[in-house]
From Swiss-Prot:
This is Large ribosomal subunit protein uL30. GO terms for molecular function: structural constituent of ribosome. Keywords: Ribonucleoprotein, Ribosomal protein. Part of the 50S ribosomal subunit. GO terms for cellular component: cytosolic large ribosomal subunit. Belongs to the universal ribosomal protein uL30 family. The gene is rpmD. NCBIfam families: rpmD_bact. One of its GO terms (biological process) is translation. InterPro entries: Ribo_uL30_ferredoxin-like_sf (IPR036919), Ribosomal_uL30_bac-type (IPR005996), Ribosomal_uL30_ferredoxin-like (IPR016082). It comes from the Bacteria.
Length: 62
């Protein structure tokens, strides 16, 4: 398990046009709204699952 203060940084690298509505909602839930926007979130299993769901749209920076 990860420590409580570890973070994961995400960047939206592909457009949401033509994607499923549930994937768009997941990207918004991750705090990303436009291409190249960056969000820093706690590294939890829930966030990891969201990243896995939209892995073709986002890039993990750190």
């Amino acid at each position: 398990m990860t420590t409580s203060n570890s973070k994961v940084k995400l960047q939206l690298v592909r457009s949401l046009i033509g994607t499923r509505e549930s994937h768009r909602a997941t990207v918004r839930g991750l705090g990303l709204d436009r291409i190249n926007s960056v969000s820093e979130l706690e590294d939890t299993p829930a966030v990891r699952g969201m990243i896995n769901k939209v892995s073709y749209l986002v890039k993990v920076i750190g």
